[in-house]
Amino acid sequence: MFKSQLRTATARSSFRSLASKLNPQRFNSSKTPLLNATRGSNRSKNSLIALAISLSAVSSSYYLYQKDKFISADVPHWKDIELTPEIVSQHNKKDDLWVVLNGQVYDLTDFLPNHPGGQKIIIRYAGKDATKIFVPIHPPDTIEKFIPPEKHLGPLVGEFEQEEEELSDEEIDRLERIERKPPLSQMINLHDFETIARQILPPPALAYYCSAADDEVTLRENHNAYHRIFFNPKILIDVKDVDISTEFFGEKTSAPFYISATALAKLGHPEGEVAIAKGAGREDVVQMISTLASCSFDEIADARIPGQQQWYQLYVNADRSITEKAVRHAEERGMKGLFITVDAPSLGRREKDMKMKFEADSDVQGDDEDIDRSQGASRALSSFIDPSLSWKDIAFIKSITKMPIVIKGVQRKEDVLLAAEHGLQGVVLSNHGGRQLDYTRAPVEVLAEVMPILKERGLDQKIDIFVDGGVRRGTDVLKALCLGAKGVGLGRPFLYAMSSYGDKGVTKAIQLLKDEIEMNMRLLGVNKIEELTPELLDTRSIHNRAVPVAKDYLYEQNYQRMSGAEFRPGIED
C-alpha cells in the first residue's frame, strides 16, 4: 500500500518533503535527476551515482594538487550573450560540450579527453545541468580550481525544465528505511551504526565505503586477529578513578584513539568531513583529514573548535612543489601532525566498487570495447599518486615542515626500523583497511612482532607506533595499547556513524567507544593508559591463524559477501 501511494503525484510530493528533511542531499526535490528514477530504473540511477563518485574522487585529488590552488583569478563572461537553457543544450557533442554547474556554464570540450575520471559522466550531461549530481560530493569551488577561467562562460539565464519521473521500488524502500531508522539513543555499539548505514546508503556509496582488495581476506583478518588475543586481568585493584586520556606528539587528548582519514564522506552525509570534525570536537578526539576529502581542507579546518586537534594525511604528488604548498598550508592552518600514506603506489582492486563502475559503463556507453575495466571510484584516484615515492624523499619532506612526520601504511618490522633510522616521529601499522594488497598481515599481528624488537634496541621511546584496521570494540583498542601502540585509528565505523546520524552520530560513536574502554580498563585492573602492558595479554595464538575462535556474529552479520558476475537484466526488468 505504501509503495502504491508513493506513485501518485501527491504522495510523491509529500514523501519528497519528508525525505528532504531526513537528508536534503540524498533526496532534494522533483528536479533531482539521480533520485527521481522511473520505475525499474534503479540500476540506471545507481550507475549515475557510481560515475559521480569516480568524478568526485579524481577531482578532489586534482583540486588539491593544482599549482594555482591558492591563486584566485577573474572569471570572464562569454561574449555578453545570454546563456539560456536553449543555447546551452545545443552544445551537447564531444567536440562542443558545455555543462551547467551551480548556475554557471562551463565549456569542457578541451578538458573532456584529459578528464582523469573518464569522459562518460561528462558526456551524459553534455548541454545539461549537472549540479544535482556534482554538488553533493565535491568541495566548493572545485571546478574553478581545475578548469581554466576562460572556460567559465558565465551564468545560466533561466532554468532547465525537468521531467517528472517515478521512483523505483528499491529507492522507495531505501527512503522508507531512512524514515524508520531507530533513534540515536538505541545505538549501543559501533556495529549498530554499520547495520543502519548498510540499509540507508545508496548502493554505490556503500560499495565504495565497504569494498576491499581482491577476495577481502585481509579486510576480515584485520578484525579476526583481535579475537586471537586474550586478557590476563588483575584483581583487587582500586579502580575507582580511571583516566583514559593520553598524549599524541605532546598534545593532550581525551582518548587513546583517533578518527582515521577516509575519502568522500559526503557520499554518506551532506556535511561530510565537516560533520566528523564537529562530532570529534565535542569529544576532544583527533581527526585525521584526508587528502581526498569531499569537503575542502579549509572547510574542515574551519569547523574546529578552540583546542581541537587535527592531523593531515598526504598523498605525495610527483610535482614536489605541489606537495610542498599543500604541506605548508596544512601547517599554517594548525595541523598537529603530517601522516604520509606510503602503501598506495597504485590503488588495489576493490571489486565491489568496480562492479558499480561496470554498471555505470554499460548504461552510459554501449560499446564495451572502449570500457576501462580497471576503474572504479577508488582506482580512478591512482593517477594522482606518485609511484616513485621512496625513502630518499623523507629528507625533502622533513625540510618543508616542522610538523611531526608519520608514515602511514607500514606492514613489516623492517620498515618500522627504517623509519626510526630516518628520524620519523612515528609509523602507522596499516594495510589501508584491507583495500590495497590482499593477504597482508593484520596490523595488530605486526605490532605484536615489532614492539619487542624496538624495546630490545632501545627505540620504543624514540618512535610512536600507531595502528589501525579492524577495530570495532574498546577491547580491541586496549589490546593494541597493551602491545605498545601509542594510539589506535578507526575509519569506517565513524563513516557509518556519520552516514546514519550526522555529526551527532559521530559524537555518540566516540562516547560508546570511550565507555567501553573505561569499563574494560576497570575490569583489567588498571587506572591509566600507561598501566596497559603486554603482561595483561595472552598472545600465544596471535600468529596462529588456524586456531578456532568464537564467531563475532555482529561483524559477520554486517559483512557484505562478494558476488560473482551477473547477467544483464532482461527486457521485463
Curated annotation (Swiss-Prot):
Q: Which reaction does it catalyse?
A: (S)-lactate + 2 Fe(III)-[cytochrome c] = 2 Fe(II)-[cytochrome c] + pyruvate + 2 H(+)
The record's annotation in Pfam families points to:
Cyt-b5 (PF00173), FMN_dh (PF01070)
EC supergroup of this enzyme: oxidoreductase
Q: Which GO terms describe its molecular function?
A: heme binding; L-lactate dehydrogenase (cytochrome) activity; metal ion binding
The Swiss-Prot or TrEMBL record lists the needed cofactor(s) as: FMN; heme b
Q: Which SUPFAM superfamilies match?
A: Cytochrome b5-like heme/steroid binding domain, FMN-linked oxidoreductases
Q: FMN hydroxy acid dehydrogenase domain location, by residue?
A: 182-542
> From its record, what is one biological process in GO terms?
lactate metabolic process
* Location of the transit peptide in the chain: 1-73
What note does UniProt attach to the cofactor annotation? Binds 1 heme b (iron(II)-protoporphyrin IX) group non-covalently per subunit.
InterPro entries linked: Aldolase_TIM (IPR013785), Cyt_B5-like_heme/steroid-bd (IPR001199), Cyt_B5-like_heme/steroid_sf (IPR036400), Cyt_B5_heme-BS (IPR018506), FMN-dep_DH (IPR000262), FMN_HAD (IPR037396), FMN_hydac_DH_AS (IPR008259), L-MDH/L-LDH_FMN-bd (IPR037458)
UniProt keywords, alphabetically:
Electron transport, Flavoprotein, FMN, Heme, Iron, Metal-binding, Mitochondrion, Oxidoreductase, Respiratory chain, Transit peptide, Transport
- Cytochrome b5 heme-binding domain segment(s): 80-157
Principal place where this protein is found?
mitochondrion
Q: Which residues bind pyruvate?
A: 208, 315, 432, 435
- Which Enzyme Commission number(s) are listed? 1.1.2.3
Q: What does this protein do?
A: Catalyzes the oxidation of (S)-lactate (L-lactate) to pyruvate with subsequent transfer of electrons to cytochrome c. Is involved in the utilization of (S)-lactate as a sole source of carbon for growth.
Homology family: In the N-terminal section; belongs to the cytochrome b5 family. In the C-terminal section; belongs to the FMN-dependent alpha-hydroxy acid dehydrogenase family.
| Subunit-structure text | Homotetramer.
Task: Give the PANTHER family listed for this entry.
Answer: L-LACTATE DEHYDROGENASE (CYTOCHROME), S -2-HYDROXY-ACID OXIDASE-RELATED
- For this entry, the protein name equals L-lactate dehydrogenase (cytochrome)
Gene from which the chain derives: CYB2
